[in-house]
């Protein structure tokens, strides 16, 4: 019996290979992780394992708990879930906590790796009943893969073509009911048909200072490092309202404290560590300040197109739009206008530049944003 291999929507007999190795090659696929594991986490012990352990996003958590409890009572599969929001706000954490609440495992996939339907078929056909499939950066899957997911999400089935040429025939493959969790930093790039197939859609917003401080205090205990309340607050202030950044800066301050300050994080130690890392009082790092410097000094405060800023900084627009601009916008340091990006008076002041007394429509741009 010849081996079977996936080729897009086609499943055809594998032709014998003129090599010493067998023609039956194992099918490659993304590894499956339990609900308490995550391949992207440098320090998994900082990641909450259950929804009740999470800090912040209380409205989102409450709605998810209701949906999970209802699905358990009905003995039914949980509806598909879409998370959107800036990076580092907990989309992957939700994707690990939800399976734990359901008592199932989760398989992690990344949108950019799904080049064709054949890349998705092994994962779909190997899912256990009610298992969770998580696709990160789901906005980056190609149209062919997206359309292939429609029947899988709605009817839990996929169409396969067996054989080749005139001998080809369509086979309707029934999938076990599963929950798809998608995560995106660009919800606007999702097509309407795909977006509408998610029964639950949640937007994750930036965290409050109190929530971020609580996260830092909790995680300092997990890292077995002593920290004062003032130091925890200072780290939170400089963490851009983002838990992932807060955890990264906590780790750096911990390393600094253990190396230079007898292993205790005080406000003085936190300030010294963050200043050494070039994190300023607003939480802006070198890249953020370079963006503002480019916009203010090189582009005279704007309005300037994102492509011009990216080219001047020798970086890609996606990085600026996904990782830099969301916090600058929230901090009222820049504006997005129809004519381009504009630096606000607050940005001029923070970067120690004199704001223009009058410019090319500056006042009008500020009034009409």
What is each stretch, according to the model?
Residues 239-252, 264, 284-285, 303:
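The conserved phosphate-sensing helix
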Residues 164-183:
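AAA+/SF3 P-loop NTPase mechanochemical coupling elements
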Residues 117, 131-161, 187-197:
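Conserved AAA+/SF3 P-loop NTPase catalytic/coupling segment centered on the Walker-B
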Residues 42-80:
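Pre-Walker A (pre-P-loop) alpha-helix and adjacent loop at the N terminus of AAA/AAA+ ATPase modules
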Residues 73, 78-109, 124-128:
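Walker A/P-loop
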Residues 256-278, 288, 343-345:
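Conserved C-terminal helix/linker of AAA+ ATPases
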Residues 190-222, 229-237, 248:
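Conserved AAA+ ATPase core "coupling" helix
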Residues 298-369:
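Terminal-proximal interaction/regulatory segments of ATP-powered molecular machines
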